[in-house]
Amino acid sequence: MYKAPKMRFAPRRIAEIPFRGTIAAGVFNTLVSGRIAYPFRITEVKMIFTDDANNWIRHGWYVGRNRSQPTTGPPTGVNIFGRESPVADFVGKAIIRVVPCNIEYPEGGMIIHFYTQNSGPYAYERNASCTIEAM
């Protein structure tokens, strides 16, 4: 009788970091996560564009080591999707945009920045999340 070896699977540490808040008309704004002390990989980002986004809302995802929240443009740090595409921001209307990815940050101490530019005439309620997995 053959007995298969026991397989051991380490539990995966997965977290979904929410980003939510109102942004006034005609401004830039950045929301930041807490410091992520361990090595991680970003596995998915999700952005909800409502009907009133009307392609006026532009989102971008950045990582860096400081908690800067500039009000005149994108945050300092590296655009997460900048190495994958020359156009690394997301624009939409009436869509839930889910972007699966596998972007690793082997050093700890990073902070995720969710950047929004509202070019429209109205305030906008933004809603997004970033899913990370410990490495």
Predicted features and spans:
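Beta-strand-centric surfaces of beta-sandwich/beta-rich domains
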Residues: 1-135
